């Protein structure tokens, strides 16, 4: 797979569009709607994409060859000469190798008219200066550089992904759709995990409340038991507790057990119950699940 980098805001905007259409209109999103949001690749090194046809082809079919040119300017010099200044390179083009290639073309006389070649890059940005003879047309030299060097390069787009463990070339909408399906799976698993943990904790708190309501008897049972197992079994039998609840009680030191504040436990339990209700609502309603992903 070879997918060019994109502007994150545009990609997120497209995913949000898919979610909104499902929630508000109960329909799929068209590729045309996606193309209104995602304008094209966003190469971090800059460069200029030549033509829009290849971009649309990539988004519609999952395959295309996108031509990218360096950003250049022709600057007149004080001595009457011109120079070509390169300030942005096509994606993945190595600056040092590019300069070597230009020098090689000049040395082999495949390009005639370049008198000096300098890397003037600094912390302000990338800059390559190509000085020319007075008698040459800078546009002709520039076109020769596009032809023979990576000042013009091709990015081959292949939007390949595993779908049901099978490689498949996807268009842009399909790629975003499967990404959203993955997010649905991730959020569902996470919510089930959070629900399970919240229910486990609530279950323990319910046992602690029972223990507090019968604190003297609980302490008597623990002190009168030969070992932890006997204490746990006695608590389970007398107060109809589960093994997890009774284990949580016997695991606490008596000082900690007697120091528990019922109001704090009840407050935590009430908060947990809200979360439990929220988790269950998310798992029961696809639109709520999509809203969680969106936010």
Q: Which residues make up each language-model segment?
A:
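C-terminal interaction appendages of subunits in large macromolecular complexes
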Residues: 2-295
């Amino acid at each position: 797979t070879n997918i060019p980098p994109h502007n994150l805001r545009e990609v997120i905007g497209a995913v949000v569009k898919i979610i909104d259409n499902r929630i508000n209109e109960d329909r799929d999103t068209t590729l045309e709607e996606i193309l209104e949001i995602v304008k094209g690749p966003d190469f971090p090194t800059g460069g200029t994409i030549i033509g829009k046809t290849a971009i649309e082809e990539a988004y519609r079919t999952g395959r295309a060859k996108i031509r990218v040119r360096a950003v250049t300017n022709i600057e007149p010099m004080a001595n009457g000469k011109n120079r070509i200044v390169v300030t942005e390179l096509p994606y993945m083009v190595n600056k040092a190798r590019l300069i070597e290639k230009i020098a090689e073309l000049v040395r082999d006389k495949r390009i005639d008219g370049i008198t000096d070649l300098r890397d003037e890059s600094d912390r302000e940005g990338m800059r390559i200066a190509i000085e020319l003879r007075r008698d040459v047309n800078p546009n002709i030299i520039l076109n020769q550089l596009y032809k023979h060097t990576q000042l013009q390069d091709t990015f081959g787009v292949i939007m390949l992904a595993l779908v049901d463990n099978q490689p498949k070339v996807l268009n842009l909408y399909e790629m975003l759709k499967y990404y959203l399906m993955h997010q649905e799976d991730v959020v569902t698993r996470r919510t089930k995990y959070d629900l399970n943990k919240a229910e486990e904790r609530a279950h323990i708190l319910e046992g602690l409340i029972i223990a507090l309501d019968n604190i003297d008897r609980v302490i008597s049972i623990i002190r009168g038991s030969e070992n932890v197992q006997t204490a746990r079994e006695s608590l389970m039998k007398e107060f109809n507790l589960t093994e997890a609840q009774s284990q949580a009680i016997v695991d606490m030191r008596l000082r900690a057990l007697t120091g528990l504040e019922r109001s704090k436990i009840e407050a935590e339990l009430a908060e947990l119950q809200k979360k439990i209700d929220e988790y269950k609502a998310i798992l029961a309603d696809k639109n709520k699940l999509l809203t969680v992903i969106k936010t």
